[in-house]
């Protein structure tokens, strides 16, 4: 991979937001992986309702929202209760959202409502990279499970490892258990907030170098798909992971 670059935008008088990654990726459609717990769930849901119009205004669309249920396997230190995946037309449009003063006011609710918040921008493996207009239809008979993978060190080397991650092996694993990969992605860009006057930079923390969602007609299929003996043999040496059922709500 070439030397990582970045794009940026001033979002307040003293803070510039940047996305660090390869320009050909972060200037393309991206998927924001929000993986978190809540302090006050009702406040978070209120924030979502209020912020939706600002996200839609810049072309953002929700791909998936769900609450984790039964843990399947892996390191529970990586576990969170909620997963939200949002598609953005490009990194530039996402930075436009961060600079929206109304969105910034609404984000006060999110900060108050969530904890152990992991956020990173991913590139999807496969299509569509940019979701079509219109709401997706949720089949109540579908069952989902998520696999979150953290690579050994979140550095330029780990981005290279994520780029070469063997998604085809997970596809075959899903098929063996009568399941299908609904969504698969890997890290493309990390958000960094620069405090201009203090010359300080704060990178938003994230746990998820790779995210994979599978779905099936039965809960047993997705549980079996991400059982520990199935997953561990497919991951790079030193990688950690967590897998859980997810109840889709959007």
PLM regions and their residue ranges:
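Polyanionic, intrinsically disordered low-complexity tracts enriched in Asp/Glu and S/T/P/G repeats
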Residues: 110-111
């Amino acid at each position: 991979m070439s030397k990582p670059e970045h794009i940026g935008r001033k979002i307040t008088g003293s803070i510039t937001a940047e996305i660090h990654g390869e320009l050909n990726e972060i200037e393309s459609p991206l998927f924001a992986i929000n993986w978190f717990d809540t302090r006050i769930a009702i406040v978070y849901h209120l924030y979502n309702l209020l912020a939706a119009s600002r996200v839609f205004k810049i072309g953002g669309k929700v791909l998936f929202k769900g609450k984790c249920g039964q843990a399947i396997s892996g390191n529970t230190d990586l576990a969170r209760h909620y997963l939200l995946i949002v598609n953005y037309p490009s990194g530039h449009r996402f930075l436009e959202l961060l600079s929206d003063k109304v969105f910034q006011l609404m984000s006060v609710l999110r900060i108050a409502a969530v904890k152990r918040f992991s956020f990173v921008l991913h590139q999807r493996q496969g299509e569509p990279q940019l979701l079509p207009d219109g709401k997706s239809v949720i089949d109540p008979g579908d069952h989902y499970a998520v696999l979150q993978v953290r690579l050994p060190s979140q550095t330029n080397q780990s981005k290279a490892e994520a780029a070469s991650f063997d998604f085809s092996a997970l596809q075959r694993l899903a098929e063996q258990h009568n399941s299908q990969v609904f969504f698969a992605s890997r890290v493309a860009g990390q958000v960094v907030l620069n405090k201009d006057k203090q010359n300080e930079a704060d990178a938003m923390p994230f746990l998820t170098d790779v995210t994979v969602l599978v779905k099936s007609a039965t809960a047993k299929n997705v549980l079996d798909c991400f059982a520990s003996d199935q997953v561990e043999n497919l991951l790079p040496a030193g990688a950690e992971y967590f897998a859980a059922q997810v109840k889709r709500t959007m």
